[in-house]
Amino acid sequence: MKRLLASSLLILLSGCSLMQPPIESAETIQGTTTVDAVEGDKSESNSGLTDALRNRTDPVAGDPAWAPIHPKGKPEHYAAETGSLFNLASSSSMYDDSKPRGVGDIITVTLNESTKAAKSADADLNKKNDASMDPLAVGGKDLTIGDYNFSYALKNDNKFSGSAAANQSNSMSGSITVEVIEVLANGNLVIRGEKWLTLNTGDEYIRLSGTIRPDDIDFDNTIASNRISNARIQYSGTGTNQDMQEPGFLARFFNVSL
C-alpha cells in the first residue's frame, strides 16, 4: 500500500512540472524591439526631463531601423582546371551597365522636391425680413384699445461677410546615397538610407525610403526623387537650433486652451 501511494505521488509531481509554462530567456526579450520605417526606434526609453517637457525625442545615428543590409558572402566554388584562361564566374558582358540589381547595391537619389498649395474662400450672406399690418377698422373707424390700434411693422436685416486664404510652399534640393534593402518579385527595388551632418550646435539628418524601378535609374547610377514610389523623405535636426524653432510646453498649453 505504501509503495502504491509513493508511486502515485511521484507521478503527480512529475505531471505538475510538465504543465509549467516555458521560461523566456532574457536574450529573446531584449532582442525584440519595435521600429518604424522612417522615425526609427519607437521603444520607450528614459530620455530625461528635457524630452518630457518638449514632448519630442530626437532620433540618433545608428538606428537599427536604418542600418545598412549587406549581402552574405557566397561560398567559393572550386571548379576543375580546364586549362582555359576564360572564367565564366568573373565574366561580364560588354553591353552590361552598372545599375544596382541586388541587396546592398548603392544608388544616389537626387532630391528635387517642390510643392505649392493655395486656397481661398469668400462668403457673403444677406437676409432681410419685412412684416407689417395695417390697423383694424370696424365701421370705418380704427379699432383701438387705449392708444394701441393693433398695427405693427417689423424689419430685420442680417448680413455676413467672410474670407479666408491659405498659401504653402516647400522645396528641397540636394542628394543622398542609399542602399537596396530588398528586391521585389517584379524586379522593383526597395531602397533606404540616411545621412547625418554634425554641426557646432547639433546634428542635421536626411532619411529616405521608398520603391524604385530599375528602368528609371540613369546611366550615372542616379534617380530623381519624384521617381520614387511610396517615398518618405525626412529632413530635420537635433540640438539647440531645432529646439528654438519649436514653442515651449507652456505656449502649447495656452494655445490649446484658447
UniProtKB/Swiss-Prot annotation:
Alphabetical GO biological process terms: bacterial-type flagellum-dependent cell motility
Gene Ontology cellular component list: bacterial-type flagellum basal body, distal rod, L ring; cell outer membrane
Sites of N-palmitoyl cysteine lipidation: 16
Residue span of region Disordered: 34-64
Subcellular location: Cell outer membrane; Bacterial flagellum basal body
Record has Nucleotide-binding as a keyword: no
Lipidated sites in chain (S-diacylglycerol cysteine): 16
An MF annotation (GO) of this entry: cytoskeletal motor activity
Bilayer topology annotation: Lipid-anchor
Domain of life: Bacteria
Keywords annotated in UniProt: Bacterial flagellum, Cell outer membrane, Lipoprotein, Membrane, Palmitate, Signal
Signal peptide stretch: 1-15
NCBIfam families attached to this UniProt entry: PRK00249.1-2
Assembly notes: The basal body constitutes a major portion of the flagellar organelle and consists of four rings (L,P,S, and M) mounted on a central rod.
Its biological purpose: Assembles around the rod to form the L-ring and probably protects the motor/basal body from shearing forces during rotation.
Stated family: Belongs to the FlgH family.
Protein name in the entry: Flagellar L-ring protein
Gene: flgH
